Amino acid sequence: MKDHEYHALTDAFFQYVEDTVDAGYPDIDCERAGGVLTLSFENKTKVIINKQEPLHQIWVATRENGFHFELQGESWIDNRFGHELKTLLSKACTTQAGEPVQFP
């Protein structure tokens, strides 16, 4: 994948996350600074999503672990545990928010 393709895909994903949070989860604060998107919860925990441009990956840090996602076909898949990005993000945000959060 070329750098411009990577940036288009990751920018679209970051926008999707922001739009989903803004539309349905007023208790989650979403802030983007450059290649980092931070989701902050009322209990002071965070989920941090960031671009890893040299590797063409998306990294996610949760309260429980760190994950490295690579594009496989149409999905971002964690290269260690095999989790799909939206599924993992839904689970992590649900755990940290203490209420159901979905990224369909």
From Swiss-Prot:
Keyword Nucleotide-binding: no
Purpose: Involved in iron-sulfur (Fe-S) cluster assembly. May act as a regulator of Fe-S biogenesis.
CDD domains: Frataxin (cd00503)
GO cellular component, one term: cytosol
Taxonomic lineage: Bacteria, Pseudomonadati, Pseudomonadota, Gammaproteobacteria, Aeromonadales
Gene3D superfamilies registered for this protein in UniProt: Frataxin/CyaY (3.30.920.10)
Record keywords, A-Z: Iron, Metal-binding
Molecular functions per Gene Ontology: ferric iron binding; ferrous iron binding
Protein family: Belongs to the frataxin family.
PROSITE patterns reported in the protein's UniProt record: FRATAXIN_1, FRATAXIN_2
A Pfam family assignment: Frataxin_Cyay
Descriptive protein name: Iron-sulfur cluster assembly protein CyaY
Example GO BP: iron-sulfur cluster assembly
UniProt xrefs under SMART domains: Frataxin_Cyay
InterPro entries in UniProt: CyaY (IPR047584), Frataxin/CyaY (IPR002908), Frataxin/CyaY_sf (IPR036524), Frataxin_CS (IPR020895)
HAMAP family: CyaY
